[in-house]
């Protein structure tokens, strides 16, 4: 595959106004994408965004570029990433575009594309778009320019879709739920979904102002929702990230329920209903406790590289349906084509209702093992992981941990760091083992 200049594993992302994230590039990107997408299909593209102040600027630039290439544009306004994927499918659009940097701060932004079926755009199409970016922008003739319209009922369509994933014979009546929208794209969606299903909802992180997205709220900053669940004596909390593709939960004791535990709940529920196809895909960072808990139920478990893109690839390769990351990206291919925080929350609530159980009861059989991560900086071009000293330290630790422990050593893809991760039954022992390996890495640096 050719080397990419613009697209990363999750579209284009960076600090606004520098590097690639400029209105100039967005205009050219819209035109280049329009050139590629106009070769077939409906010549219709949907654009959604999160609540960052820069979203308006990039939306206008993309809209102009796509129109200049002859594509019609349908604007959704602030909507979650999975909503763009869903409406791209239902409108039979040629593509969907999301303007978001997900869980990053407001001063970052990004652009990514969905294909007509709501999945991430094919690698070859991204390379074709990159090739067009190298050409001068030439506008189509005036009578061929694309038209721009707004999807006025986008919010209502997506709310109904989300609710459709909950059993029709059940309600959430009697449940008090804290919902944290991260001041992001779900602020006008998530509280409504859970209220319309019958829950009493206390919304936080639901007042975006353009610069407060993910700021001390949301799935990457759990302190506030944990405090609110306890203060309001709520049954549980649901925390989403800025673009709504990630979820973390909180039980009534104020304890965080992460992506691994959510995967366990969904797998158990699917197995109990006889609808589990194959097993569960996690990542190299998934807690060993998930692996062991699924083993006890004879549910296969496989690990992909870190990143929801790689989880999806392995799910498709194995023809399984459920997978995700401990960070809260949850994929259930029976309920969508991409990670969807609201839908994942609904599926957990459905499991609670079906089993007449609390969140604590559903996660109780899964023991989360202590996990320690140590980052070791190294200098030079050599690879510390090839050192005999490091290999010997790893072998010693793995021997002492046995089947109830795990060691993972990997290089950072962005910094000169070796990440040392150790899991086991006892935190102090795990910490000592991690430091032992880290010291070996340092001495080999």
UniProtKB/Swiss-Prot annotation:
Top-level class of the enzyme under EC nomenclature: isomerase
Gene3D superfamilies in the record: Alpha-D-Glucose-1,6-Bisphosphate, subunit A, domain 3, Alpha-D-phosphohexomutase, C-terminal domain
Cofactor: Mg(2+)
Positions annotated to bind Mg(2+): 102, 241, 243, 245
Reported modifications of this chain: Activated by phosphorylation.
Positions carrying Phosphoserine: 102
Entry keywords, A to Z: Isomerase, Magnesium, Metal-binding, Phosphoprotein
Entry annotation: catalytic residues: 102
Transmembrane segments: none
One GO molecular-function entry: phosphoglucosamine mutase activity
One CC-aspect GO term: cytosol
EC number: 5.4.2.10
GO biological process, one term: carbohydrate metabolic process
Similarity section: Belongs to the phosphohexose mutase family.
Name listed for the protein in its UniProt record: Phosphoglucosamine mutase
Organism (species): Shewanella oneidensis (strain ATCC 700550 / JCM 31522 / CIP 106686 / LMG 19005 / NCIMB 14063 / MR-1)
Gene: glmM
